Amino acid sequence: DPLADNTDLYAFVSPDEPGTVTIIAAYVPMQLPHGGPNYFGFGENIRYEIHIDNNIATPGDDIIYRFTFKKVHEDPTTFFYIRLGAQNHKTTYTLERSRDGGLTFTTLIEGGIVPPNNIGPRSINGPAGLNTTYAELMENALATTADGERVFCGPTDDPFFVDLGGVFDLGDMPRQDSEPRDGVACLNVSTIALKIPIEWLQKDGKTELEASSILDPDFVIGIWASASRQTIRTLNAAGSESYGGDWIQVSRLGMPL
């Protein structure tokens, strides 16, 4: 299930804002930025979630950030991804947050912007395309919630280094006859990035300045990411699909880097 596949999870104190934690969850591996005509990315009818456990006295997660995505085709008359200011596979997201382990959710962002793939200068910069810069598209995709969380969802270069050819060639690593090669170089993943104030993650709402030490157990959190689908998919006679049933986890990744 590539669209629901967790690739990597990262969590660290933000180097530019020590009062926040940055969490990055990557999905949908091995994407070519110019990989038309399908342009794989975040899937519809999938719940992408980041789970946070900030209280060792209670089981399970305490905070959940849930992302769901929608796609529209602004110019269905063409197979081009972008043309004359219109974008196909245009993706937006809704962000919800639970602070009671998933019992209730509050909507933080609706209609969040997912930037398009950087498929080439004619499509991004040219007058027959979007007539802008990719830097501006990425900047416009940054969002801030009313509570101060910073959010980004979109395609990014896969930051991981792994010699996939060596790994799956009977564990040929380091390579016996050549240098290691980055198997994910110049390939994208679909990234969910959050920058969250520490007081929103600490169980009692304390800031980092209130920690007794770097090992203060009240400031230790557990983080994992998941993707879930509903159990029933119906292929309708007209060619459309409908979904129902319980939501079941189909991908999970912990032990953040």
Could you describe each region identified by the protein language model?
Residues 1-257:
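Surface-exposed extracytoplasmic segments
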